[in-house]
Amino acid sequence: MSTVTGAAGIGLATLAADGSVLDTWFPAPELTESGTSATSRLAVSDVPVELAALIGRDDDRRTETIAVRTVIGSLDDVAADPYDAYLRLHLLSHRLVAPHGLNAGGLFGVLTNVVWTNHGPCAIDGFEAVRARLRRRGPVTVYGVDKFPRMVDYVVPTGVRIADADRVRLGAHLAPGTTVMHEGFVNYNAGTLGASMVEGRISAGVVVGDGSDVGGGASIMGTLSGGGTHVISIGKRCLLGANSGLGISLGDDCVVEAGLYVTAGTRVTMPDSNSVKARELSGSSNLLFRRNSVSGAVEVLARDGQGIALNEDLHAN
């Protein structure tokens, strides 16, 4: 019996003057059986008409757009090159693969730092001369200088709302019913598994369950910096209060009080007055984390029943 462990896609790649890959857009990636990883350049006649019309050089940007077919033999392997990396990011944002459903390690090492503009991606070297030429076309807006572009410039998932496109990176996984407000942020290989409200930061690797609310200014620790290796997940119907923070995983129906940052090493007072480190409660359900306003101690209490209920009108996307 065949096993779906690979992926493939026909895309358009932007090459800089030195041949480096600035980006690759895969409009219709697909999962495949395992095979041999490779990227091949396609002739104009080998791609759909709507893509063929976009192939060619842009002398103002000093770039060339080419058609490619990329095959990933196994999603368990690390990305082999920029084409491979972009295909993986598209698989996540197209919701073909959930966060941690593929190997996202090593992406930074194969991707190029790019100047992202309203006229398309540009190389950093010589950009001021490029900017001058582009100004003949109209205003030049630089969205950022980064290795990861905005998701919506490549993938617009159905059933979601994103108030600020700059706040969601390509490679984010947004389930139908998800709303990302202006101060929300979702990194790559991270996101939601169901209808969720995102007004805080979902760092790389973090997964948020159905019906949960990441409050305004709330922060969920990731693994990209600081030497952390623990991958944090939040279960269903959880609430991270405004300006709260989380460094452990939560099960279902949990609440973290507004303004409270619970790290793995935070000492937490139990209902029986014993004190434990929060990491010992990681993954538990039906808990309320709060700070005692008199003693200042962080307390955890048991909660009965299900957690929060989202406003359905805000998630009918």
From Swiss-Prot:
Mg(2+) 1 binds at D166. Succinyl-CoA binds at R201, G216, S219, A242, E257, A258, G265, K277, R290, R291, N292, S293. One of its GO terms (molecular function) is 2,3,4,5-tetrahydropyridine-2,6-dicarboxylate N-succinyltransferase activity. The keyword Cytoplasm applies. It is an enzyme of class 2 (transferase). InterPro entries: DapD_actinobacteria, Hexapep, THDPS_M, THDPS_M_sf, Trimer_LpxA-like_sf, Type2_DapD. Pathway: Amino-acid biosynthesis; L-lysine biosynthesis via DAP pathway; LL-2,6-diaminopimelate from (S)-tetrahydrodipicolinate (succinylase route): step 1/3. Disulfide bonds: none annotated. Is activated by Mg(2+), Ca(2+) and Mn(2+), and inhibited by Zn(2+) and Co(2+). Is not inhibited by EDTA in vitro. Changing G222P: Loss of activity. The active site is at E199. GO terms for cellular component: cytoplasm; peptidoglycan-based cell wall; plasma membrane. Mg(2+) 2 binds at E183. Its EC number is 2.3.1.117. HAMAP family: DapD_type2. Was identified as a high-confidence drug target. Belongs to the type 2 tetrahydrodipicolinate N-succinyltransferase family. Homotrimer. Catalyzes the conversion of the cyclic tetrahydrodipicolinate (THDP) into the acyclic N-succinyl-L-2-amino-6-oxopimelate using succinyl-CoA. This is 2,3,4,5-tetrahydropyridine-2,6-dicarboxylate N-succinyltransferase. The gene is dapD.
